[in-house]
């Protein structure tokens, strides 16, 4: 994990970075279900999952979102603050044993009328699996301080 100050003016449209990978485990499923109370059989019942397309349990979308966002924390910008996420989509299923990583692309920059000392930056997050397929996509909106 590293810290780097990047002001609003310094963000470049199209800039891309790729995180390290992380393999999804049985433990991830169990811990996430316990934290959220989401024990749907699609995630937790191996016999039920055999009847589904793909024949195996599907990772919780919220878990993949959490892990995918967490992977981006390898770079910390102390002058950027999360405003929220838009356009979250669970594009493909993730299974135990899949390895995911997150591609972060700067997709938009705009003025912030409520905060004249800051601007808004949109990071397009794409969580991709070991086959290079996008499994989750979202827009992360940041409020970023301008240079003084």
Question: What is the predicted function of each stretch?
Answer:
Residues 1-13, 94-99, 103-148:
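HotDog/MaoC-like acyl-thioester-processing domains
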Residues 41-43, 82-83, 88-90, 114, ...:
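Short, intrinsically disordered/low-complexity patches at protein termini
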Residues 2-84, 147:
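Hot-dog-fold acyl-thioester-processing enzymes
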Residues 74-96, 102:
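Mid-chain, well-packed structural core segment of small domains
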């Amino acid at each position: 994990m590293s810290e780097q100050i990047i002001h609003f003016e310094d963000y470049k449209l199209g800039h891309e970075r790729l995180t390290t990978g992380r393999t999804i485990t049985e433990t991830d499923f169990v811990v996430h279900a316990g934290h959220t109370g989401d024990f749907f059989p699609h995630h937790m019942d191996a016999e039920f999952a055999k009847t589904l397309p793909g024949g195996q349990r599907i990772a919780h979308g919220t878990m993949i979102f959490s892990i995918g966002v967490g992977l981006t924390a390898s770079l910390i910008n102390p002058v950027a603050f999360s405003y929220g996420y838009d356009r979250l989509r669970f594009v493909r299923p993730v299974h135990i044993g899949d390895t995911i990583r997150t591609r972060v692309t700067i997709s938009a920059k705009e003025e912030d009328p409520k905060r004249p000392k800051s601007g808004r930056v949109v990071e397009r997050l794409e969580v991709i699996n070991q086959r290079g397929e996008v499994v989750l996509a979202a827009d992360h909106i940041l409020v970023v301080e301008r240079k003084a």
